[in-house]
């Protein structure tokens, strides 16, 4: 069984994340979405909210693809999380060259820690290359329209969270 781990903070989950989940589903038998507990990033949404959003959105993809998709909160090393969930592949999305430079370094470190776990990069589709959770939150805070970047449910949750609910 090919088990993959797609880690992220998902604060909030975007259409770019969902695109990677959909595309990874064609490559794997099971996908674990690792929701990182990253206190240094100071997420807007608490862990429970982020997990709930990821689950609500990924269940739709699981229903369409038949892939088993589960969420797994983690705050340990990514490579340890991969071992914990039985993943042999780490899935990462790339938007630009800057992402590649960082991810390339991470792959090197992860290979030193466990050379049996591979990392697979999926390039973001053109319409998703500019999407970043940080930018989506900033646009929402400044009154901009984020409907092109997140699902309607995530849009409502984000606007509610920042006090812009209609």
Swiss-Prot record:
GO terms for biological process: coenzyme A biosynthetic process. GO terms for molecular function: ATP binding; pantetheine-phosphate adenylyltransferase activity. Pathway: Cofactor biosynthesis; coenzyme A biosynthesis; CoA from (R)-pantothenate: step 4/5. One of its GO terms (cellular component) is cytoplasm. Pfam families: CTP_transf_like (PF01467). This is Phosphopantetheine adenylyltransferase. It catalyses: (R)-4'-phosphopantetheine + ATP + H(+) = 3'-dephospho-CoA + diphosphate. It is found in: Cytoplasm. Keywords: ATP-binding, Coenzyme A biosynthesis, Cytoplasm, Magnesium, Nucleotide-binding, Nucleotidyltransferase, Transferase. Homohexamer. Substrate binds at residues 9, 41, 78, 92. Its EC number is 2.7.7.3. Reversibly transfers an adenylyl group from ATP to 4'-phosphopantetheine, yielding dephospho-CoA (dPCoA) and pyrophosphate. The record marks 17 as: Transition state stabilizer. ATP binds at residues 9-10, 17, 93-95, 103, 128-134.
């Amino acid at each position: 069984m090919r088990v993959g781990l797609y880690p992220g903070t998902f604060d909030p989950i975007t259409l770019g994340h969902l695109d990677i989940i959909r595309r990874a589903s064609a490559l794997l038998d099971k996908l674990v979405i690792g929701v990182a507990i990253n206190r240094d990033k100071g997420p807007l949404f608490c862990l429970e909210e982020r997990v709930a959003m990821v689950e609500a959105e990924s269940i739709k993809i699981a229903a369409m693809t038949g892939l088993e998709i589960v969420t797994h909160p983690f705050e340990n090393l990514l490579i340890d999380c991969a071992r914990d969930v039985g993943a042999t592949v780490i899935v990462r999305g790339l938007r630009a060259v800057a992402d590649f430079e960082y991810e390339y370094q991470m792959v090197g470190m992860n290979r030193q820690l466990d050379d049996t776990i591979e990392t697979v990069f999926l390039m973001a589709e053109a319409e998703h290359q500019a999407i970043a959770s940080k930018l989506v939150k900033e646009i929402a805070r400044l009154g901009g329209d984020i409907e092109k970047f997140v699902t309607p449910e995530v849009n409502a949750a984000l606007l509610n969270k920042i006090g812009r609910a209609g």
